[in-house]
């Protein structure tokens, strides 16, 4: 009797939600509190070379998008959230942070 794994790590190949170029274009025009889903799946799996269902080119593109989002979040420009849909299925969402204007910052 062979035991089947409870959950398979492999997910069906998906297309990228957005390219890095389109993500950067959105960043340039988005207003505070606007949001975009920059990936649907599992960043842990989809960025991992041995596990990813994506081609090397798409996997590198996804990593570039995720890295850019993380850096901008760390600098306070974005808020990053996840919405869980199921096992290994998440929406990764970037939200433009509301930032006080320079006059408000000077008053602090």
Regions found by a protein language model. Give the residues of each.
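Short amphipathic alpha-helical interface segments
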Residues: 2-59
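A generic structural micro-environment signature
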Residues: 7, 44, 84-86, 100-102
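Short secondary-structure junctions
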Residues: 31-32, 73-75
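Residues in well-ordered beta-strands of folded domains
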Residues: 39, 81, 95
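Short amphipathic alpha-helical interaction segments
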Residues: 58-74
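A short, conserved structural fragment
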Residues: 74-83
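Short, amphipathic alpha-helical interaction segments positioned at domain boundaries
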Residues: 87-108
């Amino acid at each position: 009797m062979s035991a089947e794994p409870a959950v398979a790590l492999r997910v069906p190949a998906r297309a990228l939600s957005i390219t890095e170029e389109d993500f950067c274009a959105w960043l340039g025009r988005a207003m505070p509190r606007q949001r975009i889903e920059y990936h649907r799946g599992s960043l842990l799996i989809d960025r991992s070379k041995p596990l990813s269902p994506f081609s090397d080119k798409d996997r590198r593109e996804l990593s570039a998008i995720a890295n850019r989002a993380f850096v901008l979040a760390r600098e306070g420009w974005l808020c990053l959230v996840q919405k869980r849909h199921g096992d290994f299925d998440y929406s990764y969402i970037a939200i433009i942070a509301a930032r006080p204007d320079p006059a408000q910052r000077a008053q602090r």
